[in-house]
């Protein structure tokens, strides 16, 4: 966050606790996904699996971005993916969004963070997360993932201002109070918005979710989003964004000079991580050699990770090699 030069970058991966990992698979034999998320003891055990097996620098709260929608009153289940009993529209919003104090529903996340931190070694920290406001609206309103150039309508702006942003602000506060070092906003469908609307939306989002928590909230978006728009916000000291996560479609090396503050997280391809081990290693070598073209001062602020989350088809030996070959200081000196 402070962009101090480091010979060895910190590393964490989105979905580092997940279906590719034998530890997670064993837990899923006895518990549902919702139990692993909502029972703090199990959430801590799930989050600690990749820390113990792969020695990542950071644990990630084990949870799901959609629980705030359930907290608001929407009927959410996982079979195995998320399903809603009904989706939001202008006609049913008042009958579906019924909970008066939705943040109370989210208390399990705070306890999960506390229990995970209790088990972490002293040299490791924990990252929390929330879903991006537009991503939650897209799920709630059943907006097709293929949609592009969306212009926000009055109903969506009302949801954003009066429902989603206030709850996410409380959710971030809850996670930070429980001990999260940083809370990431994972906004995986923000690229659906038209450019003018994206700028408007990001202004509202950062004004509501980052200014009260200076340098404590990071932002991630993907799939062709205009990162220049986000970087303009990141470089504004009044916004106090902790950092930016980028996908694998861009050259990460360009972004250290474009950003004047905060971290830049990414961006080895999660698809390369799914390759057979003998095919994965050359791709990792290319990535490491590209980053070695920058000295520690030039890549200050880098958090080593992926362009998105670890995929379920990832061979478990690949994350082991990723941490061992990427992290040793001898590689990056």
Model-derived segments and spans:
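N-terminal small/glycine-rich loop or linker at the start of catalytic domains
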Residues: 5-34, 65, 72-78, 127-158, ...
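Conserved, mostly hydrophobic/aromatic
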Residues: 10, 51, 116, 175, ...
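Conserved small/polar residues in nucleotide/adenosyl-binding loops
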Residues: 323-329
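Glycine-rich, proline-tolerant flexible connector loops at the mouths of alpha/beta enzymes
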Residues: 62-74, 183-197
